[in-house]
Amino acid sequence: MDIRKVTTAEVLPIRHLVLWPNKSPSFCEVEGDDSATHYGAYAGGKLVCVASVYNNGHEARLRKFATLPEYQGQGIGTKVIESLVRDLKRENVSYFWCDARTSALSFYQKFGLCVEGEEFHKSNVAYFKMSVSWEQEPQT
């Protein structure tokens, strides 16, 4: 498996197929996509998992994290999150957060994210905000 940075155009089809197949493809576009960092995991040369990070200085937000159904449960998403977390820490991001579907809370907890606040809904799907704070590395 190979994890690398990819383009917005590459992530959109997987976002649509996995996250919102009953919506229009444009529903899967996010303001800020052009300046976001998009990660992709390839298995056998095929893009199978995507995640997008919107970095605002020392704060970063994960959005539109999706793995093709036939590749779920194989640890691919875990490796993508581990890779982007390493990058964020290297960039001295101190606060990382996402809106997590309630079905995925335990997945994000593996990376130290904790629930913040109350459950809320987007397009009839239940979510919680989850976040983690990291100590910044001293500048040398």
Task: Identify what each model region corresponds to.
Residues 55-65, 72, 122-127:
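A conserved beta-turn-beta hairpin within the catalytic core of GNAT-like acetyltransferases
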Residues 80, 104-107:
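Conserved short alpha-helix immediately C-terminal to the canonical SAM/SAH-binding motif I
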Residues 1-43, 134-140:
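Short amphipathic alpha-helix that is part of the acyltransferase structural core
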Residues 67, 73-86:
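Conserved acetyl-CoA-binding loop-helix of GNAT-fold acetyltransferases
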Residues 88-101:
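Conserved GNAT acetyl-CoA-binding A-motif
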Residues 99, 114-132:
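Conserved catalytic-core motifs of GNAT/GCN5-like acyltransferases
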Residues 15, 108, 113:
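Conserved active-site tyrosine of GNAT-family acetyltransferases
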